[in-house]
Amino acid sequence: MNDNAFTFQTLHPETIMDALFEQGIRVDSGLTPLNSYENRVYQFQDEDRRRFVVKFYRPERWSVDQIREEHQFALELVKDEVPVAAPLAFNGQTLLAHQGYHYAIFPSVGGRQFEADNIDQMEAVGRYLGRLHQTGRKRPFTFRPDIGLAEYLFEPRQVFEDAALIPSGQKAAFLKATDTLLSAVTECWRTDFATLRLHGDCHAGNILWRDGPLFVDLDDARNGPAIQDLWMLLNGDKAEQRMQLETIIEAYEEISEFDTAEIGLIEPLRAMRLVYYLAWLIRRWGDPAFPKNFPWLTGEDYWQRQTTTFIEQTKILHEPPLQLTPMY
C-alpha cells in the first residue's frame, strides 16, 4: 500500500467501535474526532464513564517496529516520571490491530493549553525536557530514523519537482528558491551533535498544562540533537526568544547537560521543517481530508508566499545564529 494515496474512507464508526469492543471497551458516547490529519484520533467515553482516546495509524507511514519503539519510549518516560500520554496495554500489547488498521488506546487526559509566553511554564517545560532527554540518552531508536537532510530536504525537493498541483506560473521560481535554501542549509548543517531519542515535534500545541506540563503525541519521535525539542517553543522577536531559550536551558541543565553549540542548528532545523511540511501536504493530497482542509494549496498566491518565505529563510541562514548572554 502506498501511504501517499491512502485514505481512511474505510474506517467507519462501526469499525472503530468493533475494534474497541475486541479489547473489552464498550463505547457509551459518540466518537469525537480530534485534530489530526496524519492519523485518525477519536475521544470517547465507555459504559463506566471512563474517557479514552483511540488513535488509528496511517498505514505504511511507520512500520510495526517503529510504532512499538514509540510506545516503548513513552512507557520508559512514564517509568522515569516524565509526564507523557502513554498507550494502554491490552493482554500485554500496546499496538493493536483490526481489519488491517493498527491502533492504540490512551487514557484521555485533559488540560489547558500551554502558554508559550508564560516564563514560569516555560521553565517547567525546560526542566521536564531535561528529564525527557535524560531518558532519551539511555539508548537510540533502532528502527525510527535520525533527523537528517535526506528526509527533510532532498526527498521533499523531488516531491516538489514531480508535483502537478504547484501552479505552472510559480513552479520555476519556487524550485529556484528551494534549491537556494537547500544549499544554505547544507552549508550550515553539522552532524557532530550528540544523538538521543526525541519527542520530535515539541511545539506548544503538543503540551497540555495541568499543574505542570504534559507532553502528548510522540508520533514524530526520532533520533536527533536536543535542540530539536527546544526551538519550536520559542516565539516573538530575537530578544524574547533569547530570554525564553535561556529560561529553558537553565531549567534543562538542572537535570541534563546541554550543548549550547546546538543553538546554531535552530535556523537549519526551521528551514528543514518548512520544506518537509510542504512536501507532506503534497504527499497527502490524495486523502480527501487534505483538499478539504487546505484548499489554498493549489493557489498561485500561496506558492508565491512560500517562495518568499524560502528566500527570507535563506537570508536568515546567512546571519549569525541566536546568541545567549555572556554568562552562557
Swiss-Prot record:
Its main location: cytoplasm. A protein kinase that phosphorylates Ser and Thr residues. Probably acts to suppress the effects of stress linked to accumulation of reactive oxygen species. Probably involved in the extracytoplasmic stress response. Pfam families: APH (PF01636). It is an enzyme of class 2 (transferase). The active site is at D201, D217. Monomer. It comes from Salmonella choleraesuis (strain SC-B67). GO terms for cellular component: cytoplasm. Its EC number is 2.7.11.1. GO terms for molecular function: ATP binding; magnesium ion binding; protein serine kinase activity; protein serine/threonine kinase activity. This is Stress response kinase A. It catalyses: L-seryl-[protein] + ATP = O-phospho-L-seryl-[protein] + ADP + H(+); L-threonyl-[protein] + ATP = O-phospho-L-threonyl-[protein] + ADP + H(+). Its cofactor is Mg(2+). Mg(2+) binds at N206, D217. The record marks S36 as: ATP. HAMAP family: SrkA_kinase. Belongs to the SrkA/RdoA protein kinase family. It is found in: Cytoplasm. Keywords: ATP-binding, Cytoplasm, Kinase, Magnesium, Metal-binding, Nucleotide-binding, Phosphoprotein, Serine/threonine-protein kinase, Stress response, Transferase. It comes from the Bacteria.
